[in-house]
Amino acid sequence: MLGLRPPLLALVGLLSLGCVLSQECTKFKVSSCRECIESGPGCTWCQKLNFTGPGDPDSIRCDTRPQLLMRGCAADDIMDPTSLAETQEDHNGGQKQLSPQKVTLYLRPGQAAAFNVTFRRAKGYPIDLYYLMDLSYSMLDDLRNVKKLGGDLLRALNEITESGRIGFGSFVDKTVLPFVNTHPDKLRNPCPNKEKECQPPFAFRHVLKLTNNSNQFQTEVGKQLISGNLDAPEGGLDAMMQVAACPEEIGWRNVTRLLVFATDDGFHFAGDGKLGAILTPNDGRCHLEDNLYKRSNEFDYPSVGQLAHKLAENNIQPIFAVTSRMVKTYEKLTEIIPKSAVGELSEDSSNVVHLIKNAYNKLSSRVFLDHNALPDTLKVTYDSFCSNGVTHRNQPRGDCDGVQINVPITFQVKVTATECIQEQSFVIRALGFTDIVTVQVLPQCECRCRDQSRDRSLCHGKGFLECGICRCDTGYIGKNCECQTQGRSSQELEGSCRKDNNSIICSGLGDCVCGQCLCHTSDVPGKLIYGQYCECDTINCERYNGQVCGGPGRGLCFCGKCRCHPGFEGSACQCERTTEGCLNPRRVECSGRGRCRCNVCECHSGYQLPLCQECPGCPSPCGKYISCAECLKFEKGPFGKNCSAACPGLQLSNNPVKGRTCKERDSEGCWVAYTLEQQDGMDRYLIYVDESRECVAGPNIAAIVGGTVAGIVLIGILLLVIWKALIHLSDLREYRRFEKEKLKSQWNNDNPLFKSATTTVMNPKFAES
């Protein structure tokens, strides 16, 4: 399997990576060497005979190399396949910029294989250049100049390469509203100047196939007429997609492919087609008919990502020749489209030849190393060691700038498989160049153990040995094929080793031997696996102070629960069986109002730690025990002579006590003062009752009634006196006013009410005579 050694740099990187990954081996239910190798890059398998003891699982054979060596497995018995890379050069000759041309990888899951790819930029590499021009009306001056540039463009290419070809295509936009005016007259002549001869709008027209004939270029371009549309953005991405998707129609060779995109405005992209009721996404296929993109009104514009993928797939490098106001817009576009460049185009395109030369030099001096699409099970990273001293590590693609002619640069490619893969291959290429590296990937998952299949005695003659373990014949099972199934299926035997249908065989911690679980021995010190289904062990219990069940001195673990030794208790035997910390000064546990657990009181509701003596939030007992105080001291009240039964928790004291002072009314309405001193326990008090009661005499009913009647009468008399006084004052005031008016009046002999019956009238004419 091994051929040429991989380069030293790749080998060093691979070994250093392997050292890191080999420090651990995470495994689960491993029963073969292949399953062990698939568990991780740090796992190795011991094929030594009798390496496992009675009850040991086969998974004991799978561990890190240091662990297996420590357990007595010889180095020759350890199976540890590694990922390898074999390189093969192409000896067919020809100018190759990438080497090697073929690499074969043998990949172990989780372990990378590394190899080097060298790129050497060649001088005079063949070039195909396709000039794609915007023919909207604003590009009128540019079209005039481009018609004269055929010879200049080809001469510029010949300065760079000995084999250059040029082609030409043009675009405007989709021929539906709102992109163009769909009035019949405007469709025939979309230009604002009616006297100007214009061609109808179109999405994309392939004018000239790639050729080295500059006269033909000049002739065909000279026939082109300007056109027009409505909105500012153009349908340039539509045209670029067709140029990339139609290699045969365009005439692309397998050489450096340049696409010059000349415009003075922006571009429509995916989703804009909805404005014209075009809902079908762009399919990225060639739809040229008679050199026209006639189905442009059926498909939406392509997305930028879709176009970038198509350009990279066909190894086309776009050069955006745009006017000054659009430079920033297209610079943003080049960040998404790899291996692309932007040049500032003069208003009349007079500098296009110089622009193309500069852009080509910029593109060819930067190298991107990338690969085609891969399944999720393969991961590829690149380390770039550029000639200018710059290094990029662990990148999704290789990237070097400032690459000079005939100066080699190196990329280290690391490929990792996440699982055992099927045989497959992928291609690595330098974007914009035609050379490729074919990488064939093979799985490295099998163990090449010593062939002992003929020695059947080690398996009781009922099987053969494979990598240290027996593979039994039909009808026999067991570690050494010692168990005969006797017609029972393996499923039936395994069913006896399951707790229920949803559980795994022997809880995953034992082997099912002849229908019975043989529990594994554990690598963990002190762990014993047992039980009918190996469901129990001596370690999976609660811990205290970092030890199972508080340590051997406190208790032992039995099937998930701690059994504590005498003197200890608790779910993890964390508590000592003593109540010293719970005793009050009277040596009563938690004052009779709680429970002592782990030498700490757990008080009844409301009572406070540490000894459950106080209950700040509890209701006052005064009102509850007034009847008891009355019967204990005075032998009165509702309890009467049945006081001892009604008040069992109270004890009468003849001497004053300390505690809660109460003052309540008894059944006779007298105030009784007493003091309650709480004793140990619930509702237990020592009570001292004051002998004197404050009894209030009954009310004098006659005095109350007489006083009430007298008060009402007096109030009535007082109101009458006040009313009479007010009437008198009002009459007095009226009389005095009458007296004043009488003094002011003057009387004569004439009756002021009499009117004379005689009326005298003077004749005015009498005086004139």
Swiss-Prot record:
Record's bilayer topology term: Single-pass type I membrane protein
Record PTM text: Both Ser-745 and Ser-756 become phosphorylated when T-cells are exposed to phorbol esters. Phosphorylation on Thr-758 (but not on Ser-756) allows interaction with 14-3-3 proteins.
Chain location of the short sequence motif Cell attachment site per the record: 397-399
GO MF terms, alphabetically ordered: amyloid-beta binding; cell adhesion molecule binding; complement component C3b binding; heat shock protein binding; ICAM-3 receptor activity; integrin binding; metal ion binding; protein kinase binding
Compartments it resides in: Cell membrane; Membrane raft
Positions bound to Ca(2+) 2: D173, N229, D231, P233, E234
Glycosylated residue positions: N50, N116, N212, N254, N501, N642
Keywords: Calcium, Cell adhesion, Cell membrane, Disease variant, Disulfide bond, EGF-like domain, Glycoprotein, Integrin, Magnesium, Membrane, Metal-binding, Phagocytosis, Phosphoprotein, Pyrrolidone carboxylic acid, Receptor, Repeat, Signal, Transmembrane, Transmembrane helix
Pfam families: EGF_integrin, Integrin_b_cyt, Integrin_B_tail, Integrin_beta, PSI_integrin
General function of this protein: Integrin ITGAL/ITGB2 is a receptor for ICAM1, ICAM2, ICAM3 and ICAM4. Integrin ITGAL/ITGB2 is also a receptor for the secreted form of ubiquitin-like protein ISG15; the interaction is mediated by ITGAL. Integrins ITGAM/ITGB2 and ITGAX/ITGB2 are receptors for the iC3b fragment of the third complement component and for fibrinogen. Integrin ITGAX/ITGB2 recognizes the sequence G-P-R in fibrinogen alpha-chain. Integrin ITGAM/ITGB2 recognizes P1 and P2 peptides of fibrinogen gamma chain. Integrin ITGAM/ITGB2 is also a receptor for factor X. Integrin ITGAD/ITGB2 is a receptor for ICAM3 and VCAM1.
Family: Belongs to the integrin beta chain family.
Protein name: Integrin beta-2
Protein species of origin: Homo sapiens (Human)
Lineage of source species: Eukaryota, Metazoa, Chordata, Craniata, Vertebrata
